[in-house]
């Protein structure tokens, strides 16, 4: 019988060497956590931080965000896939929270049981499984694994999830590989691997290893081989290493580079407050 807990720890140990630096420690109000999850799905931490900062600084306050058009909100997610879909979910979240509480606060979710909190999040239209699980794990500390599409692709390649599993199914499968206390660190390093632009194509569904070779007991050895091949290809192409940066694909199927650019977050605030109004010309 495969001891997935031990394999999960060994995987994290290997990924820490590949992607050095501390895993981010997120402490946000529940509403901000939910909005951040929308930024983070299928993106790198750097991209998510940039988009989240834009979200809080590009509009006068959260009410202006709530009443803005999808087109206006989508500009916040420039450089990420599915910008309109992210904008749609942001607006749905803000509509739900404001109409329920008549303010932009959602801290009551922390006081609910996992069952009741999950039911409440399901009432917000069009949230993804990742949005819900990230919020439940971050705000309530529950034993759920926030897994998005790219992370699922990587988990299947590793052999930790079965071929064809959806992110929701993979999240349940991965629980056996991670202790509750280790979920944030495990999820962070799995994300680093999943969005690495050198590797993301290797994890695409059509390129997954067969069931016979996608053995979780050999995943570290296979990963080390993949790292060497990807690094050699990058050196041959004259590219510098850029682990942890997400590959963003445009509508025509081409990849475009991503940076930490975009609007500077000149103003930040708690999700319940508002930034000072900008001067208008």
What are these regions (language model features)?
Residues 1-111, 181, 188-281:
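N-terminal polyanion-binding entry modules of DNA glycosylases/AP lyases
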Residues 34, 38-39, 90, 113-159, ...:
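Catalytic DNA-binding helix-loop module of base-excision-repair DNA glycosylases/AP lyases
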Residues 143-145, 149-210:
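Compact, basic/aliphatic-enriched, mixed alpha/beta core segments that act as assembly/interaction modules
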């Amino acid at each position: 019988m495969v001891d997935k807990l031990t394999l999960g720890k060994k995987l994290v140990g290997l990924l820490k060497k590949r992607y050095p630096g501390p895993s981010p420690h997120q402490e946000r109000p529940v509403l901000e956590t939910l909005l951040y999850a929308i930024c983070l799905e299928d993106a790198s931490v750097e991209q998510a931080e940039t988009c989240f900062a834009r979200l809080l600084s590009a509009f006068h306050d959260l009410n202006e965000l709530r009443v803005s058009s999808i087109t206006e909100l989508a500009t916040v997610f420039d450089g990420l896939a599915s910008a309109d879909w992210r904008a749609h979910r942001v607006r749905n979240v803000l509509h739900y929270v404001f109409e329920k509480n008549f303010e932009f606060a959602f801290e009551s979710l922390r006081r609910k049981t996992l069952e009741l909190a999950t039911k409440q999040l399901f009432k917000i239209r069009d949230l993804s499984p990742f949005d819900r699980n990230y919020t439940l794990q971050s705000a309530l500390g529950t034993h759920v694994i926030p897994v998005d599409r790219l992370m699922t692709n990587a988990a299947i390649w590793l052999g930790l999830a079965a071929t064809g599993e959806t992110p929701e199914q993979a999240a349940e499968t991965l629980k056996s590989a991670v202790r509750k206390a280790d979920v944030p660190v495990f999820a962070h390093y799995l994300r680093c691997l999943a969005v690495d632009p050198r590797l993301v194509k290797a994890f695409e569904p059509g390129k997954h290893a067969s069931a016979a070779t996608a053995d979780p007991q050999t995943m570290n050895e296979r990963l080390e081989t993949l790292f060497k091949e990807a690094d050699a290809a990058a050196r041959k192409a004259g590219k510098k290493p850029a682990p942890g940066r997400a590959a963003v694909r445009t509508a025509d199927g081409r990849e475009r580079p991503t940076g930490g650019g975009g609007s500077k977050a000149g103003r930040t605030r708690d999700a319940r407050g508002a930034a000072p109004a900008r001067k208008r010309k």
